[in-house]
Amino acid sequence: LRDHPGQISFPGGRVEPQDVSPAATALREAEEEVGLDPARVEVVGYLPVYRTVTGFCVTPVVAIVKPPVDLRPDPGEVADVFEVPLSFLLDSANHQRCTTQFEGRQRDFYAVPYGDRYIWGATAGIILGLARLLSLR
C-alpha cells in the first residue's frame, strides 16, 4: 500500500473509468494485487460505505470465493497473503477497541489480533461491520 505500507488490508483501490460498479473495481483490484480469478468469485453484496480517518471512502464488497484458489500476489504490492477463519473474525471476543494519539489528537480504532498478525484500522473496522450485520440475521 502506497499510503499505508506494511499494513494488513483487503485488496482494493481507486475506481477506474472501465469499472461499472464497486464490485467491478473490487474484482479488478483483487486480480491485479493477488491474482484472484474473477470467475471464482460470487459477489453477494455490499457493506455500508466505510470512511477512514485519513479521508478515504471505501465501499466494502462481500463475496464468496469458490475453492480451489490459486493466488499469485504481485510482489510490488503484496508482501504476504494469509487466511483467517470466518468464525474467528465474527467472534466478538476477538475484537478490540483501541485508542492512540495521532497528530496531536486522540484516535479510536478497531483491532483483530490473529496470532502474530495485527489486523487494525479500516480493515478491522470493515470486518467488525460485517460481523455486526451478520449478527442481526
Give the ranges of each region predicted by the language model:
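Unchanged
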Residues: 1, 14-119, 128-137
